[in-house]
């Protein structure tokens, strides 16, 4: 079975700050009788102190009343962005949260042609100075969020025990799935969290029997081809097929994959074509009983 949720019919081009769109999806993986769990999934904020629109949007996320928050990385895009990010997320940090980092949490962005992502990836990474990611890590963990970059953890949300695991950024080849590999322990469901959805990560998590995977990185393709009734990603900036560039998809018996198209862009390439900024509200529900 191949599943892909309907995408937004957005064919605009923008090079300035835009308010986000809300993507909603449902994943039927909970045991029968368990209460639904509202998961707020966001990614790729690429925050700078100047991004007032995005900061205000992030502060409004609490109004979606999530039970669990998952961030799949790239919080930062500026040396002074850590206090900005922690302030924007302040209300959400009172909720259970899981996070991993992306390349832009480690290194400042540098000017480059955004259309280069349409070319074959030769593995060469261009990045700027080191960013103060340890301060971000400390700030998030001090409020109770769990760093899944190289770890597993078990949490309980409502009446559901969730085993979680994650990897560091595969785009920088910082990932090492062997550190968290193995079948889930006692739990109701098992989920994976990673920034860049490279197939080696997805395949490892699928082999271990996870129920769902959350990722970001792709920006939904960032520059999509407008088509009647929707649009098509031209790239994912990794080896994930373009039809899975954003939203909820499922292939065969593999775990559900939810890829956030993200909120931001590099400060040097503030353009998104037919791929508006978005945040997702993913509701985990009980599987249908037949």
Where do the PLM segments sit?
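Acidic/histidine-rich helix-loop elements
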Residues: 14, 36-55, 76-78, 107-128, ...
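Binuclear metal-dependent hydrolase catalytic cores centered on His/Asp/Glu-rich metal-binding motifs
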Residues: 112-145, 151-152, 157-203, 269-272
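Beta-strand-turn-beta hairpins that frame and shape the catalytic cleft
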Residues: 20, 26-40, 145-146, 152-164, ...
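Conserved beta-sheet core of the metallophosphoesterase superfamily
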Residues: 98, 197-280
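Core catalytic region of metal-dependent phosphoesterases/phosphodiesterases
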Residues: 52-156
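Short, conserved loop/helix-junction motifs that constitute active-site signature segments
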Residues: 64, 89-94, 182-186, 205-208
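Active-site neighborhood of phospho(di)ester-bond hydrolases with catalytic His/Asp-centered motifs
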Residues: 41-43, 68-74, 97-103, 148-150, ...
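N-terminal active-site segment of His-dependent metallophosphoesterases
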Residues: 2-88, 108
């Amino acid at each position: 079975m191949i599943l892909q949720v309907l995408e937004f019919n957005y064919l605009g081009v923008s090079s300035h700050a835009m308010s986000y769109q809300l993507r909603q999806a449902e994943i039927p993986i909970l045991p029968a009788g368990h209460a639904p769990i509202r998961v707020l999934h966001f990614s790729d904020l690429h925050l700078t102190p100047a991004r007032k629109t995005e900061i205000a949007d992030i502060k409004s996320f609490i109004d979606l009343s999530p039970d669990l928050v998952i961030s799949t990385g790239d919080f930062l895009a500026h040396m002074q962005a850590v206090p900005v990010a922690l302030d924007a997320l302040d209300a959400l940090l009172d909720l259970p949260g899981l996070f991993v980092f992306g390349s832009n949490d480690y290194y400042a962005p540098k000017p480059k042609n955004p259309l280069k992502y349409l070319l074959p990836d030769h593995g060469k990474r261009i990045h700027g100075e080191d960013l103060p990611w340890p301060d971000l890590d400390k700030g998030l963990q001090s409020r109770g969020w769990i760093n899944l970059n190289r770890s597993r953890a078990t949490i309980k949300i409502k009446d559901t025990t969730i085993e979680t695991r994650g990897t560091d950024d595969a785009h920088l080849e910082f990932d090492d799935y062997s550190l968290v590999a193995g079948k889930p322990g006692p739990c109701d469901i098992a989920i994976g969290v990673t920034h860049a959805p490279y197939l080696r990560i997805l395949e490892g998590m699928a082999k271990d029997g996870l129920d769902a995977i959350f990722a970001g990185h792709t920006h939904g393709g960032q520059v999509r081809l407008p088509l009647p009734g929707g649009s098509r990603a031209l790239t994912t900036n990794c080896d994930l097929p373009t039809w899975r560039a954003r939203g909820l998809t499922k292939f065969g018996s593999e775990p559900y994959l939810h890829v956030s198209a993200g909120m931001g862009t590099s400060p040097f390439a503030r353009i998104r074509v037919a791929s508006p900024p978005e945040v997702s509200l993913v509701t985990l529900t009980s599987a249908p009983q037949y």
